[in-house]
């Protein structure tokens, strides 16, 4: 089934792209959530008229992503966890905990967009990549200290 994307969808396409997807994916996810329209001739004509608006929306989303990336780049998360004598944590710091800490500081990010090379299991300073937009990534500084 062909659909016209109304939002940027990772691994699928950008706003305004006409893509072919499985019918179930379109019916059960993309169309009900408002992420896409069915690619009919009527919707294609409406898309032609809305191209300028979509381009404006793309630029606006990209600019918002860049502003958010600048906020995240200036952010340093300080976490305190219980640790053993060798600095090994009892448990691990995961992307979900980082998302909660960022939310507490006023930046709401989906935990799936925070990428850790591996879960943090030791005390020290670490970096995490935050994938805000397909074209915009930010680096988050994380410091884990002993509680």
UniProtKB/Swiss-Prot annotation:
Pfam families according to UniProt: Ribosomal_L9_C, Ribosomal_L9_N
GO BP annotations, alphabetical order: translation
Database matches in PROSITE patterns: RIBOSOMAL_L9
InterPro entries: Ribosomal_bL9, Ribosomal_bL9/RNase_H1_N, Ribosomal_bL9_bac/chp, Ribosomal_bL9_C, Ribosomal_bL9_C_sf, Ribosomal_bL9_N, Ribosomal_bL9_N_sf
Recorded GO MF terms: rRNA binding; structural constituent of ribosome
SUPFAM superfamilies on file: L9 N-domain-like, Ribosomal protein L9 C-domain
Protein biosynthesis among keywords: no
Record's GO cellular component terms: ribonucleoprotein complex; ribosome
Keywords, ordered alphabetically: Ribonucleoprotein, Ribosomal protein, RNA-binding, rRNA-binding
Similarity comment: Belongs to the bacterial ribosomal protein bL9 family.
Its job: Binds to the 23S rRNA.
Protein name per UniProt: Large ribosomal subunit protein bL9
Species assigned in the record: Geotalea uraniireducens (strain Rf4) (Geobacter uraniireducens)
């Amino acid at each position: 089934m062909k659909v016209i994307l109304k939002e940027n969808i990772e691994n699928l396409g950008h706003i305004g792209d006409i893509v072919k997807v499985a019918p179930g994916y379109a019916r059960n996810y993309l169309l009900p959530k408002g992420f896409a329209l069915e690619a009919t001739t009527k919707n294609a004509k409406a898309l032609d008229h809305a191209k300028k608006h979509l381009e404006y929306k793309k630029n606006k989303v990209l600019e918002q992503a860049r502003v958010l990336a600048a906020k995240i780049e200036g952010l340093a998360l300080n976490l305190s966890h219980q640790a053993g004598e060798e600095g090994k944590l009892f448990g691990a710091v995961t992307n979900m905990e980082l998302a909660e800490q960022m939310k507490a500081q006023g930046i709401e990010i989906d935990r799936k967009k925070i990428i850790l090379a591996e879960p943090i299991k030791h005390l020290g300073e670490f970096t995490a990549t935050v994938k805000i937009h397909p074209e915009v990534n930010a680096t988050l500084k994380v410091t884990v200290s002993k509680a």
